[in-house]
A protein has these predicted regions:
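Conserved N-terminal segment of class I S-adenosyl-L-methionine
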Residues: 1-88, 92, 106-109, 124, ...
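A short beta-strand submotif of the Rossmann-like class I SAM-dependent methyltransferase core
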Residues: 92-98
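Histidine-centered beta-alpha loop that forms part of the nucleotide-sugar donor binding/catalytic region
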Residues: 97, 127-129, 180-181
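Short N-terminal helix/helix-N-cap motif within the alpha/beta-hydrolase-1
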Residues: 103-107, 134
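A short glycine-rich, Lys/Arg-flanked "PGG" loop and its adjoining helix->strand segment in the class I
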Residues: 107-118
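Conserved beta-strand signature within the Rossmann-like core of class I S-adenosyl-L-methionine
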Residues: 120-126
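Short, flexible, mixed-charge acidic loops at enzyme active sites
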Residues: 135-143
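Acceptor-substrate binding/catalytic loop of class I
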Residues: 146-163
Length: 230
């Protein structure tokens, strides 16, 4: 759902109700300039906060209040583990508008799970492919990719609510909260309100999902994602 002109420096307000009261160490995965990490740090009173992103320009212009900003590909073996060794463990991991851009987000979630302590929290924002605009385009055969948004041409994976929850739980994390973001389309908000939420799967633009780590080993997702794309 990235907007290349402003995503890297925008704050994701819809996920704020899911934030823990306190978080000592924050890792913002694919977080651009680290704006969210900096904002959440202020809210949660964090001692350590940093960002990792694949875009050199975003990291070059990262928020200077952060403790670290790393330019690297989180899908490459050893990258997440190296960040953990130097700066972890992280009791809050942010994955905001990034998982849909990855070839194997299931494997990344498993690696992030492994660098969280018991009681740690992961929060993801994931676009909803069941949104009425996507359904309309499939039915009319007008699926045209764009530079950003729901039809971002760099999206590699697509999720509805159930598969987004499955993604977050693939390695043993437990989802305990899911919030819906409707976007700014007035008619979608009216339809959602009049239907008392029954049209939620179609009016929801994005899901904000919170998952927690409890005691126990990290489960290997294996080929979990090979048969799940929506």
């Amino acid at each position: 759902m990235r907007n290349p002109s402003n995503y890297a420096k925008s704050v994701n307000r819809p996920m704020w109700p899911l934030l823990p009261a306190r978080a000592a160490r924050i890792l913002d995965v694919g977080g651009g300039h680290g704006t969210n990490a900096a904002a959440v740090r202020s809210k949660c009173g964090s001692r350590i906060a940093g960002v990792v992103d694949i875009a050199p320009d975003a990291i070059e212009h990262h928020d200077r209040s952060l403790d670290f900003a790393i330019c690297d590909d989180i899908e490459q073996p050893g990258v997440i583990e190296a960040i953990h060794t130097t700066h972890g463990p992280f009791d809050l991991v942010l994955c905001l508008d990034v998982l849909e851009h990855l070839a194997d987000p299931w494997r990344v979630i498993a690696r992030l799970h492994s660098i969280m302590p018991d009681g740690g929290t992961a929060i993801a924002s994931i676009p909803n492919i069941q949104n009425y605009r996507a359904v309309y385009r499939v039915l009319t055969g007008t699926w045209n990719y764009r530079a950003s948004g729901l039809f971002d041409r760099t999206h590699l994976r697509y999720f509805a609510r159930s598969s987004a929850v499955e993604l977050m739980e693939c390695s043993g994390l437990r989802v305990d909260a899911v919030c819906r973001a409707l976007g700014h389309h007035r008619l979608a908000r009216i339809a959602d309100r009049l239907s008392l939420g029954l049209l939620g799967p179609f009016t929801t633009l994005q899901y904000q999902i919170r998952a927690r780590r409890f005691s126990g080993d990290v489960r290997d997702p294996g080929s979990f994602g090979s048969n799940v794309s929506s």
